[in-house]
Amino acid sequence: MAEPDVSDTNTALKKSGEPGMELENNKATSGAVVTEAGFNTRKLWPDLIKLPSNRWVYSCKEIVDRLGTDPKAAQLTKKKMEKCLMYFYMIKKNLRLFDHTYTAACILFFRYWYIYELPQSLQDCIHLSQAILATACKAMENNRPLDMYVKATCEFMMKDLAQQQRGRQNMDKLKWDVRDKLVRYEKQLLCQFGFDLDLQNPKELIEEIFSGFYRFNRDNIMDEEFKKLFPKILAEARNFIIQAGTQPVSLLCDGYTFTALALLFAGLQYKRSTAPNFRFPRHFFQERFPIRITGPMIVNLFTDYRILEDNFFDLKSNKGDKLEVTNEEVQSLIDEEPTDETVPNPYDYELIKDGVCSQEFLDHTESKLKELTEKIISESLKKRPVIDDNTPKDDTKRVKM
């Protein structure tokens, strides 16, 4: 089993320690700081560091086989995994984190489990999960102060202790231990992942692909009837992504395929329950995703998802028979042009760098900014009521009784 590629990073660090050596394509510039001993900061920390990129996609059989052949060991592993996923969910609620931060933590968690397996003790699994969540928060720009992670983690761990053990537990000592473990595990995680935090988070992708910019500049030509019902499909797709994150589905495909799978599942449920003639507009996926969508590919992914549900966690959010999909159903849902050519990336910088947008989008953005400004002002006034300067102040001191 191949571990994440960290060769480029390790090579750069090794070269930096050799006297007289310079990193390839990163020679010291005239602005570099050189000490009297000859140490050059640009050798160890160049202006541009090339980070390795890994393809975190595996077959369904490889994922299931990772549980091992021993039923007792597999059951113990799944028990630890369930506890870690519950930790993500509870801390997400307590710290009021974004949904895409929760999905990012789940993605990192399953990647770590597949490559390195989980620690032996359940307590160490919680420490690992805390570091994964903190890393996900930073990657998604949804970070919290260190003490908030520590406090929430300690409260989560205390709930598992018996009443007698809680009384004997030194809370201050536990907090320091949790704090130290967070720092240590976070450093360890970054090294083990090879600093590869390119998550392709489907929850983040679906918000970007259907953001206000594209809604007003690309999707404004869609059929009016489809535009009215599409928000329902989009909401169902968001729920699918969050719920599917609790199973190792993120190991089956890349983020764009995961996002397309969520939209197809939502469209399929709408077609089955409400509108038998429903179909996505022509070239809907070709114009929005840098991947080629085919019927057999989608059917295989739904089948693999069902197999993962049967082998991993029995949850209320499991889709069960809803994942039983035929190629005919998928073909009746999409209208894509079959081609063997590579699908261009619609989000290539060269294609969107001109920044041309419609006036309707500019007006929409301006109205949103005004609403946000008014909201901030009203909230600040509630916290700090306006005081009239002409009101006489009561300077009399209270007498202590």
Curated annotation (Swiss-Prot):
Alphabetical keyword list: Cell cycle, Nucleus, Transcription, Transcription regulation
Annotated SUPFAM superfamilies: Cyclin-like
Organism for this UniProt entry: Eremothecium gossypii (strain ATCC 10895 / CBS 109.51 / FGSC 9923 / NRRL Y-1056)
Purpose of the protein: Component of the BUR kinase complex involved in transcription regulation. This complex phosphorylates the UBC2/RAD6 ubiquitin-conjugating enzyme (E2), leading to monoubiquitination of histone H2B and the silencing of telomeric-associated genes. Also required for histone H3 methylation. Necessary for the recovery from pheromone-induced growth arrest in the cell cycle G1 phase. The kinase activity of the complex requires the presence of BUR2. Overexpression of BUR2 interferes with mitotic chromosome segregation.
Region (Disordered): 1-25
A GO MF label: cyclin-dependent protein serine/threonine kinase activator activity
Gene: BUR2
Biological process (GO), any one: sno(s)RNA transcription
Keyword presence, Cell cycle: yes
Protein name: Protein BUR2
Subunit structure: Belongs to the BUR kinase complex.
Compartments, as annotated in UniProt: Nucleus
GO CC list: cyclin/CDK positive transcription elongation factor complex; nucleus
